[in-house]
C-alpha cells in the first residue's frame, strides 16, 4: 500500500497468500490416502546442495494407498530412501531398482482426531494472518483519511470493501478446512 492511495488488489493478494500457505500446510498432512504432495517437504542432499525430492525424482500415485517414487539418477536412490525414512512421515520405502514404493498405512481414529486438531490449528493461524492484513489495511485507510487525502465517505466505502474481502477469505479458509477434515475422517 502506497502513501496517499489504497491498493485493494495488494490487500487481497496478501489475504490469498495466507490461504495458499494453509493449503500447502494441509497438503502435508498424511490422511491415509496417497498424495504426491505428501512428499513435498522432503529434501535430499544431491550434487552438493539440498534439493526438493521433485527435482531428483518423479512421484506418482498408482493406487489409492501407494506412492511410487521414480529416482532419475541411480546414485541418488539410497539418499532418497534415507530422506524418506528420516522425514517423520512414518513411511517405509520398498526399493526395486530406481523405484521406491511407499505403502500408506491406515490411520486409526485417535490419529485422525489429532490430524483434525492440527488442521484446525493451521486454519486458525491463516485466519489470524488475514485479520492482520485487514488491520493493516484499516490502519492505512484511517491514516490516509486523517492526512486529508480521502473523504470520510470514501473511508466508509473502502472499509466495507476491506471487511467484505476479509469475510470472503475467512469463508474460503473455512471451506478448505472442511474439505480437509472430511478427507481426514473418511475411512
Swiss-Prot record:
Cysteines paired by S-S bonds: none
Places the protein is found: Cytoplasm
Cross-referenced Gene3D superfamilies: 3.30.1360.40, Ribosome-recycling factor
Pfam short name (any one): RRF
Predominant location category: cytoplasm
CDD domains, per the entry: RRF (cd00520)
InterPro entries associated with the record: Ribosome_recyc_fac (IPR002661), Ribosome_recyc_fac_dom (IPR023584), RRF_sf (IPR036191)
CC annotations in GO: cytosol
Keyword annotations: Cytoplasm, Protein biosynthesis
A single GO molecular function term of this UniProt record: ribosomal large subunit binding
One record GO biological process: cytoplasmic translational termination
Annotated transmembrane regions: none
Family assignment from sequence similarity: Belongs to the RRF family.
The protein's role, per its UniProt record: Responsible for the release of ribosomes from messenger RNA at the termination of protein biosynthesis. May increase the efficiency of translation by recycling ribosomes from one round of translation to another.
Protein name: Ribosome-recycling factor
Organism: Xanthobacter autotrophicus (strain ATCC BAA-1158 / Py2)
